[in-house]
Amino acid sequence: MAKSKLEYIWLDGYKPTANLRGKTKIVEDFSGKLEDCPMWAFDGSSTRQAEGGSSDCLLKPVALYPDPVRRDGWIVMTEVLNPDGSPHESNGRATIDDDDDDFWFGFEQEYFLWDTDTNLPLGFPKDQTPQGQFYCSVGGANAFGREIMDRHLDICIDAGINIEGTNAEVAAGQWEFQCFAKGAAKAGDEIWVARYFLERLAEEYGIKIEYHPKPLGATDWNGSGMHANFSNSILRTCGSKETYEKICESFRPVVQEHIEVYGAYNDQRLTGDHETQSINEFSYGVSDRGASIRIPIMTVEKGYKGWLEDRRPASNGDPYKIAARII
C-alpha cells in the first residue's frame, strides 16, 4: 500500500501574533481529495489554545495542496475547533462572511530575510548606504537572498498556489510576493500556506523570516506591509466614481476596528512616512501610496470598474481576520 505524508498545519493561540504549527499524519492509499482528509486533534495546552486539564483541540481540514518538497507529501490547511466542534476563539477563518466567494483578494506579502548572526537583514549595508537602490534590483551589491525567493516561488507554483509575482523591496534583504484568489477564505489559505513554505525554506538556510512591520525601528528604512487588494461585484462592475468614494468613506468611522486586526506593532510602521498614512488618520486617493486606501489607476482607466487597495495591513497580520474585517 502506498503511504502519503499529510502535514496538518494550523494557527496557534499566541498573542498578539499567531504562529504556524504543523504535524504529520501518515495515510495509506490517500486519494488526494480534501474530503478524504480525516479530522485530527492536538494538544492545545502547548499552543496556548487550551488548559492542561482539557487540552484537546480539533483540526478541521479546509484546504489541500500538494507538497513539492516532500516525497508523497501534502499540506492540509486546517481550522482549529473546540472539542464540541465550535470554532476556537483563535480561528479567524471561521469569522469570514463570504459564502458566495463574491469578494476577491490579492495580498502583497512583504518580509525580510533575517540574518540570525548579525540580527540584521541579509546584506544590510555596513556603510550606511541609504535605501533606494534595492527596490526591484539586480546584482550582488543590491539583491540579497534571491535564491531563497526563487525557490519559494517555484515551490508555490508547483503546489498550485496562485502566486502572481515577486520582487525585491525597498530595503536591503526585503522581498515581496503576491497571491490572488476568488474568495476571501481561499485568499487567506494561499497566504498561510505560502508562508509555511517560506518558513520551511528558512530552516534550510539557517535564517529567520521576519514579518515584524518595522524590524529596523525608527530609522529611515521602510517597514513591511501586506497590502490588501480587494473587490466585490459592485466594485468590479459599478462604473461610478461616486460609488467608489462612498465605499471608501464607509471605512472612515471604523478605522480603529480595522487597525485592531491589521497586525501588531503597526503603529511603528504607519507613521505617515515611507509610503504610509498615519495610523491616526484616514485618507484615500487615486494612485496615492501615502493614503490609507489607494484607488489604483487601472481601476480609474477602466471607468471605475476594478478594485481598491487597503495599504494599512501589516506584514504580520492574519489574512483571514483582515479579509473578514474588510468584508
Regions found by a protein language model. Give the residues of each.
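Glycine-rich, acidic/polar active-site loops that bind/position phosphate-bearing ligands
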Residues: 1-327
